[in-house]
Amino acid sequence: MITLTINGKTRSVDAAPDTPLLWVLRDNLEMTGTKFGCGIAQCGACTVHIDGAATRSCITPVSAVAGKKITTIEAVGANTVGKAVQKAWLEVDVPQCGYCQSGQIMSAIALLAKNKNPSDADIDAAMSGNICRCGTYSQIRAAIHTAANMTRKEA
């Protein structure tokens, strides 16, 4: 058994140590918000936070995250930055098909947690590992700026 802290709750899972965190989340814990996209950490759909850092769960062995704080898309509304990103995503009407959105949102939150006033270049660099097949990159950038403005006003 491997003990994990996910979204503030302790969970024990029976999984091989080399099982990707993505599959533990989806299959063992039935947390399906984190998506499978490529399996090689190139698309960003599987992004979660490990101790606050955006991390690709498709290549992260579950044994590597025991004892660390894991945050998934299911818990993003629990903090100010997450709430602002969720609200901005809806205001700017970012999602089209929606498949990549959980990874996009997780990467955006990680950026805004470190940088409260990102430039376009900062956003592009932070989001460069996330692919949107629908091409909503300009809306994503606008939503991140909107969320940044919201969080600065609340500070």
Where are these regions (language model features)?
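Signature of N-terminal electron-transfer/Fe-S-associated modules in redox systems
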Residues: M1-A155
